């Protein structure tokens, strides 16, 4: 079982921003236009409100686990301790693979984004990718606080941009800026507020569900939180409300200023010049809007990559502690208490992927598309672990109030809502392919699940693991001092 002897240098301020930074990225700044175009302003807002409810209960469940067992292994360690070590092995390597690809792709895209400015074209894209990777690696090897501070300020840039955007948008809607009063007329233009029927809404709901992926990284930071029983619940509450408000209010502003029928909203090229944020700033009269949004997108990508390097290295370290990865990956530096070996291995693998992408970029991006959606499996494993934890408390005749530092509200209703939502996201991701009769897409969506099941059962067969009995689950609170 992971003991986690790392330096606990992250406080509530860091943890809140790390989670916010994980969920706010190019999906908000670039993709929201197509969401509004597909489902209309009402459909888009409703979709994010529904996903917001799921996110609240999901993060509450993760918070309950993270405060009771605050280790960097998070989802791998929860499954190992409360369910089955084979499930922990599978979830650990899955989450590691997801973030490894996300990190690599974000760094690769960053090198393309910086090419927006002619001034930075003196290096090739691959050179910029290596420079970005080297900078992020250096930020992670000195102290966990350096990582936390970097992530705090990178995320703060995104948050500040959104707040300024919402404020300028509201002033534009009521006619103070931009020389025109927009009001709420675009909410009822054409077929608005709800467009595209049930299929349009369900499609947007899927986009909304996957767009909040990354918020769960907050669980990994629990292993280096200075006071997880205090900082984790606080961060989770703040993250839910801030992410919900940022997404919903941004969509509300965009919908009021740009009608859903505007072809620019589709932004099929995913160009920064056609980002809904850029369009709104342009209509207000901010000439350098595209440069501003491009800079924010660049910081978003680097912020996500920074979190990715942190997350992948901590997963390797924790799995090594749980004897689910090579032992040498579990070494800590005596001075900094950082898993430098795991960090260096992460650096080498990401560098290798970046180089491979120069010759076979389609393979890297296809892999990310295939396994990236499997983050919902990781979310589901945390719900299963929470249910097992609560069941063990009941089985051992203990009081949840005395065992748990933080209790997720509305249990068991919360986990039930999350399970229903996750089932929908999983089924909905393939239902379009079924209706269209596209077997290749269906196979692409289902094959990762089959591979995961094979990994789980092969590990179970080789290691002869068993599901932990409820009466045998260790319910002693983790001593993080």
List where the protein language model places each region.
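C-terminal membrane-solvent junction of multi-pass transporters and transport-like membrane proteins
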Residues: 154, 329-336, 379-434, 466, ...
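Membrane-interface loop-to-helix entry segments
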Residues: 125-182, 236-240, 244, 368-381, ...
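Hydrophobic alpha-helical segments and their helix-loop junctions in multi-pass secondary transporters
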Residues: 157-189, 253-261, 379-397, 427-434, ...
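TM-loop-TM module centered on a large, flexible mid-protein loop between adjacent transmembrane helices
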Residues: 77, 84, 116-120, 188-191, ...
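Hydrophobic, membrane-embedded alpha-helices of multi-pass small-molecule transporters
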Residues: 10, 14-29, 190-253, 257, ...
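Helix-loop-helix connectors at the membrane interface of multi-pass transporters/channels
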Residues: 1-3, 76-82, 86, 107-129, ...
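Extracellular loop-to-transmembrane helix junctions
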Residues: 6-7, 12, 20, 31-129, ...
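Membrane-interface "cap" regions at the ends of multi-pass membrane proteins
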Residues: 1-33, 37-42, 55-60, 72, ...
């Amino acid at each position: 079982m992971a003991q986690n002897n790392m330096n606990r240098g992250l406080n509530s301020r860091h943890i809140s921003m790390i989670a916010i930074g994980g969920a706010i990225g190019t999906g908000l700044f670039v993709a929201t236009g197509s969401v509004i175009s597909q489902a209309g302003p009402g459909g888009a807002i409703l979709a994010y409100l529904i996903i917001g409810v799921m996110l609240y209960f999901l993060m509450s469940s993760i918070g309950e686990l993270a405060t009771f067992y605050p280790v960097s292994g998070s989802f791998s360690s929860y499954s190992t301790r409360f369910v089955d070590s084979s499930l922990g092995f599978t979830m650990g390597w899955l989450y590691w693979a997801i973030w490894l690809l996300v990190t690599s792709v974000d760094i690769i895209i960053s090198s393309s984004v910086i090419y927006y400015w002619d001034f930075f074209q003196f290096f090739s894209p691959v050179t910029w990718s290596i420079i970005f990777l080297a900078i992020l690696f250096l930020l992670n090897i000195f102290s966990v606080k350096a990582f936390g501070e970097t992530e705090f300020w990178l995320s703060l840039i995104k948050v500040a941009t959104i707040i300024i955007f919402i404020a300028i948008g509201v002033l534009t809607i009521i006619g103070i800026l931009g020389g025109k009063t927009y009001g709420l007329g675009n909410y009822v233009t054409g077929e608005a507020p709800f467009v595209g029927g049930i299929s349009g809404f369900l499609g947007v709901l899927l986009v909304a569900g996957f767009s909040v992926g990354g918020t769960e990284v907050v669980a990994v930071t629990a292993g280096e939180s200075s006071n997880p029983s205090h900082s984790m619940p606080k961060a989770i509450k703040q993250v839910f409300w801030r992410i919900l408000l940022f997404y919903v209010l941004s969509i509300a502003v965009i919908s009021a200023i740009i009608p859903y029928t505007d072809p620019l909203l589709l932004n099929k090229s995913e160009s920064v010049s056609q980002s809904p944020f850029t369009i709104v700033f342009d209509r207000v009269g901010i000439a350098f809007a595209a440069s501003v949004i491009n800079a924010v997108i660049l910081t978003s990508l680097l912020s996500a990559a920074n979190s990715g390097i942190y997350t992948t290295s901590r997963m390797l370290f924790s799995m090594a502690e749980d004897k689910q990865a090579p032992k040498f990956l579990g070494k800590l530096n005596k001075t900094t208490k950082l898993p430098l070996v795991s960090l260096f291995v992460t650096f080498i693998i990401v560098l290798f992927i970046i180089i491979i992408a120069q010759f076979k970029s389609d393979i890297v991006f296809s892999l990310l598309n295939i396994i990236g959606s499997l983050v919902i499996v990781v979310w589901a494993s945390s719900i299963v672990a929470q249910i097992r934890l609560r069941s063990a408390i009941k089985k051992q005749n203990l009081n949840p109030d005395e065992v748990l530092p933080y209790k997720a509200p509305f249990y068991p209703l919360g986990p039930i809502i999350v399970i229903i939502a996750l089932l929908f996201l999983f089924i909905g991701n393939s239902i379009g392919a079924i209706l269209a009769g596209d077997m290749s897409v269906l196979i692409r969506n289902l094959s990762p699940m089959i591979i995961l099941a094979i990994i789980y059962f092969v590990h179970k067969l080789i290691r002869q693991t068993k599901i932990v009995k409820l009466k045998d689950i260790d319910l002693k609170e983790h001593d993080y001092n």
